[in-house]
Amino acid sequence: MTISRDKTPASPTAKWLTVVGIGADGLAGLSDRARAAIAGADHVFGGTRHLALAARLIEGAAVPWPSPFDPGMAAVLARRGQPVCVLASGDPMWHGVGVTLARHVAADEMVVIPAPSAFSLAAARLTWPLAEVATLSLHGRALAHLWPHLAPGRKLLALTSDGAGPAAIANYLTALGLGHATLTVLEDLGGPAERVRQRPAANFDLGSVHDLNLVAIEFTTAATAAILPAAPGLPDDWFAHDGQLTKRELRALTLSALHPTAGQRLWD
């Protein structure tokens, strides 16, 4: 299904859409403004977990997100001008549904009421300065997205898709030669089943992990690990090739001279 990206407002004053961030603590963490938005909506869209958390406040129709997601987005946009509420995890504008909605709905049509993000809660539990931490969502994404963020001394917070995610991260890091990396698994942050556990990647024996989890990664040395360098010139043996490969030194000099920026591509 194709979704229109038209952001023409329904009327000059209509803020018909409210996106409410809700944490694992449910109603207890909601402001009066958020509660009023949920109770006053004709339709409340959200995941089944979010709808269950807010069930006592919902007076209109509770609409679970379908799979795939696009028909649900189309259903929200079809109600333009009506009071609609969308429930999201934590901060809707941080790897959340609010980002997708903002591509289709003008800022003067919507209100976003965030809750603390999983990253904020994790940084608080670990007392890590969030401004100095790399953050990444692996929800529905390959583990290879971790690779560019891995560096000695760098702290990384990775949001996973489910309870199998932390063990998969541990195996991936071990395969890169980072079995000594410390993994801290933070589960159900802000909820009744909150738990924080720590293991080295090579000896990851936590067993069952809550589906709502985030993994903190840190290591100080990586002498023999496959870490992406910050400067151009990747090792020759990192490429699949038939022997016809521009040598590392020439690649490094060429890239340095061209100084490419994000989004540019050189075909050698």
Residue ranges and their predicted role:
Residues M1-P116, S120-L121, L143:
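Class I S-adenosyl-L-methionine
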Residues G263-D268:
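Conserved class I S-adenosyl-L-methionine
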Residues A118-R154, S161:
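Short, glycine-/small-residue-rich phosphate/pyrophosphate-handling segment
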Residues R103-M110, T127-E132, L176-A181:
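A short alpha->loop->secondary-structure connector
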Residues L245-A262:
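Conserved alpha-helix/loop element of class I SAM-dependent methyltransferases that forms part
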Residues T2-V19, D32, Q82-V84, P152-Q244:
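A contiguous loop/helix-start segment that scaffolds small-molecule binding in enzyme catalytic cores
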